A protein has these predicted regions:
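Charged, cofactor-coupling segments
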Residues: 32-106
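Active-site cores enriched in adjacent His and Asp/Glu residues with nearby glycine-rich loops
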Residues: 1-33
């Protein structure tokens, strides 16, 4: 719905999408997550249940080729002993105003 709101997609894009080629893939060319460990991209069985101390990324992004623009925000989360995720990046600023303030006061 956000891509519709900012007019990167229109209703016909959504109506004509297929399961194999969803409309959002025009602007999102990678996966949403991967395991993180000794290697930057650790690979595990995707059907494996989460376990304590597993670390995964959460990587929403958008890439607008016509404007040579792209951005991806990454959070890294660890599965804690209760099985819930803990965001390891929670204190890192990601809001526009926070980043601009840091840049202006650099």
């Amino acid at each position: 719905s956000e891509l519709l709101r900012i007019k990167l997609l229109d209703k016909s894009d959504v109506q004509n999408q297929t399961k194999e080629k969803p409309a959002y893939k025009k602007y999102f060319s990678h996966g949403t997550s991967h395991h993180l460990g000794l290697d930057t991209h650790d690979y595990c069985d995707l059907d494996m249940p989460f376990e304590k101390n597993m670390v995964l990324t959460v990587e929403p992004g958008i890439y607008i080729k016509d404007e040579d623009f792209g951005i991806r925000l990454e959070d890294d989360v660890v599965i804690n002993s209760s099985g819930d995720p803990t965001n390891l990046m929670k204190n890192i600023p990601i809001q526009i105003e926070e980043i601009e303030a840091i840049m202006n006061n650099g």
